[in-house]
Amino acid sequence: MSGTNVTTAAVQSQPKQKRHLVRTLGKSLREYRKPSILTPIFVVVEGVLEILIPTVMASLIDEGITGKSMPAIVKFGLILLACSLCSLAAGFLAGKFAAIAGAGFAKNLRHDEFEKVQGFSFTNIDKFSTGSIITRLTTDVTNLQNAYSMIIRLGVRAPIMMIVAWIFSFRISPSISLVFLACIPVLAFGLCGLAVYVHPVFERVFHTYDKLNNVVDENLQGIRVVKSYTRESHEIAKFGRISQRIYKDFSKADRVMSFNNPLMMVCVYVSMILIAWMGAKQIVASGNNAALGLTTGDLTALVTYAMQILMAMMMLSMVFVMCIISQASAERICQVLNEESTVTNPANPIKEVADGSIEFDNVDFRYSDNSEKPVLDNINLKIRSGMTVGIVGGTGSAKSSLVQLVPRLYDVTDGSLKVGGVDVRKYDLEILRDQVAMVLQKNVLFSGTIADNLRWGNPNATDEEIRRACQLAQADGFIQEFPDKYDTYIEQGGTNVSGGQRQRLCIARALLKKPKILILDDSTSAVDTKTDKLIREAFHNEIPDTTKIIIAQRIASVQESDMILVMEEGRITASGTHEELLRTCDEYRSIYESQTKNQAQPEELK
């Protein structure tokens, strides 16, 4: 299934994901729960102190300045200073803990996502494109980090300030305080309208980001092909089209979200005008006498509270906008975290593989439940431990699909597959895969020294064991020619070694596992025939008890096998030794003759 097809499945499962969104993401807090709790506490302290300041200021004006009392000025001045300093300290600590909580949450979230991906089966991985997973690990996590930091700080501060400031303003003037309440439904209606319209746009943006990352990943992996075919301009144009799509969607979202600020400012200006007008009328009516009505100090406090309430509303609108953006990211991250691997350990797994025998019993296999036709159809096969089995067949005959079932990279759809006389689904996955070494078609080396790469097969391998494995894989010769020998640094993807050298290093890495089953999936295609023969001879002489399955395009690579399978369209159409198949299988004979061309016919066909 392609990366884009995950969108349909995601849409169908969104209601369930939304119900468990907070619960799923909350598991990633762990050791950062403490700063996540401390942040709101210090925010509340900061907010309450800031709200006390206008009341203290009103007393300072009315009792100190208007009343011409120096002791009152000193008293309320010191209280004002103490409130300001304590508020500053609380704000600093709130910011510090919010940063720790946000960054820690993001770190754990990335780790949890990556760990989840590592536990995926190939079926799970096929649902997501590389670019999609990269976006979810980077852009989406960053969006959630920013939103979380804002929620635990501004999301707590704003409502506290709004509620407490309104209570204080109500104590001063109930009629004027109602002005603030009138703004709330206007803002709520406007913000909800923006959210409903913009959320689908941001979802579309992040899916487009997936495509952009796919283009970059594909281009960098195939950069040599791009340059050899001078297709740079084509790739630039393709990248530009997707980038333009992101630009258009973001511009559309920004245009809509830009109404947020004007709406907020209209509420601010209208509120200030009404407060000033109503306050001035009451001051004039009372003659600035606190006993008769509003005073100048009270009006100053009301204006300050008005600004605090409206600033709190602006904070809430910022948090709201960030939540709209991050909701799409949260849903995409939860798609990964809630994805259940299709290949899991049984309740009481078997911890030992007896031998390298393999038995396919009426095995059918589909990559997807939606597939009309099975990839493998009614496979019946018995391989004794220690046998060498060759597999040949045309492109698309499901040779690789067959062998990928042995280490449970995929599970069979129907039937059963046994290794060592036990169904593979009963084994502990790690134990099974440690005993089945597989060299895939695409040979991958990682950044690091040759020795580091080889120790992927056995982290505790000694230098002697590494060299012995390389000798069997015919890799020791060219390694010794490097100036740094086994300490030679391999560039990312193994770009500084040839295809044949890369294949031999991967074979050596597999041999270091000392497996009971060794699978070579067309893993000597870049090796010359002489070296290929030396590798097979080394296998025959040095690891006779290991079951060896060799997929190859060259008949020469498999003709000495104990049994050769001929596959076509997911079925085993013939099996036998090289000589038997030459006599009985037209397809095998055709492949052999096309490769030997003008060579004389074998003795057995005369």
Give residue ranges: language-model regions:
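Membrane-integrated ABC transporters
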Residues: 1-50, 57, 65-79, 94-98, ...
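Short intracellular "coupling" helices and adjacent cytoplasmic loop segments at the cytosolic face
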Residues: 4-16, 67, 103, 111-135, ...
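Juxtamembrane helix-loop junctions of ABC transporter transmembrane domains
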Residues: 14-18, 41-42, 49-62, 83-130, ...
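Transmembrane helices of ABC transporter permease
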Residues: 31, 35-48, 59, 89, ...
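An intracellular "coupling" helix at the cytosolic face of ABC transporter transmembrane type-1 domains
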Residues: 31-34, 119-123, 139-152, 156, ...
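Alpha-helical transmembrane segments of multi-pass membrane proteins
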Residues: 35-36, 83-102, 153-160, 181-208, ...
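Helix-loop-helix
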Residues: 69-78, 164, 168-182, 252-331, ...
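ABC-type nucleotide-binding domain
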Residues: 351-606
